Amino acid sequence: MATKIRLQRHGRKGYAFYKIVVADSRAPRDGKFIERIGSYNPNTNPATIDLNFERALYWIGVGAQPTDTARNILSREGVLMMKHLLGGVKKGAFDQAAAESKFEAWLKGKKDALNNMKAKVKEAAVADDKVKLEAEKAVNKARAEAVAEKKAAEAKAKAEAEAAAAAEEATETEETPMEAAAEEAPAAESAE
C-alpha cells in the first residue's frame, strides 16, 4: 500500500492547526488515516510541533513518503537525520554508538538555535512594548500640557473678567460720591 505522511487540517477558519498522520495516498486530505503520529500548530511563534519520534522513524523506514510540509517538519525534528545515520550504520560506515553521538550533537545544535530564536522573539516583543510605552507617555504628556494650557487660559480669562468687573465696580463707586457731592453743593449754594 502506498502510504504518505501528511497533514490533516483542523481548527476554525483563519486559525488552522494540523494533525500529522500516516494515510493511504489515495485517501482524502481529512479522511481516513492509518495512524496519527503528531500535531503541528503554525499559529505560534515559533511553530509548535508535537511528534512521536519513534513511530515517525518507523514509517519513514518502511517507505512512507512525506509531503513537502511534513518533510520539513520531520527534518526539523531530526527524523530524517536519524534515518540517514541508521543508513550509515547498516552500511557499516560507523557503529550505533557513533550514530547516537552524532545525532545528539546535531540535536543539541538545533535546540540551541531554537532557544536563541525564542529569546530574540521575546526581546523584540519587550523592545516593542517599551517603544509603545514611551510613545504613549509622550502622547499623555502632550495631552496634559494642552489641558494645562487650556485651564491656564480659562483661569487668566476669568481673572481678567474679575479684574474688569472689579474696576467697573470701583468706577461706579467713585462716580457715586462725586455725584452725591455735586448734588450737595448746589443744595448748599441755594441755601445761602
Swiss-Prot record:
InterPro entries: Ribosomal_bS16, Ribosomal_bS16_dom_sf. GO terms for biological process: translation. Residues 178-192 have a biased composition (Low complexity). Residues 149-161 have a biased composition (Basic and acidic residues). Keywords: Ribonucleoprotein, Ribosomal protein. GO terms for molecular function: structural constituent of ribosome. SUPFAM superfamilies: Ribosomal protein S16. Residues 149-192 are annotated as: Disordered. Pfam families: Ribosomal_S16. It comes from the Bacteria. One of its GO terms (cellular component) is cytoplasm. Belongs to the bacterial ribosomal protein bS16 family. NCBIfam families: PRK14521.1, S16. This is Small ribosomal subunit protein bS16. It comes from Porphyromonas gingivalis (strain ATCC 33277 / DSM 20709 / CIP 103683 / JCM 12257 / NCTC 11834 / 2561).
